[in-house]
Amino acid sequence: HPDLDGLSAEDFERIFRLNVVGPFQMVRACAAALKSSQGAIVNVSSVASVLGTGSSVAYAASKAALETMSFSLARSLAPEVRVNVVAPGHTRTPWHESARGAAGAAEVEKRYSSIAPLRAISESADVADAIVWLIEGARRVTGQVVYVDGGMHIATPR
C-alpha cells in the first residue's frame, strides 16, 4: 500500500469498498438466513487496525472501520446472530514469500518474531482455527476481536 503522499482518493475508496462495503453487502444479503439458523459471522480484520501501520493508511483505517461495523452488527443482529472479528498479525503464507522473495519474507518474519511476546508469527492454520472456534465453539461470544498475532498488538507502541 502506498504511503499517504502516494495514496489517491480513488485508491483509498477502493480499499474501503473491498474491506468495509463488501463485508457489509455480504451481511445484508445473508442476514435473514443467518437469523433463522442462529448463525455466526466472523469478519477478518488485521492488527493494523490498532497499530495504524504507517505505510498503509487506507488499509489500517478500513480494518478499524470493519471492526466498528462488526460491533454494531453484533448489537443489531443479536440474539439470533453472533458477530465477531479475527485480527491476524503477520501470517506466514505463500503470498508473503512470493511478494517479498524468500530472503525478504525471512527478514520480515525475524523482525516480527523479535517483537511479538510469543516470539513467532502465525501460520494460516492459526487464523483458521480462531475462525472455526468463533463459528462453532464460542456460543456465548459476540462483539469481540480475537487477535491472532502472537501478542503483537500489546507489544508494539501505538
Give residue ranges: language-model regions.
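Short, small/polar-rich loop/turn modules that mediate ligand/substrate recognition or access, typified
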Residues: 78-82, 141-143
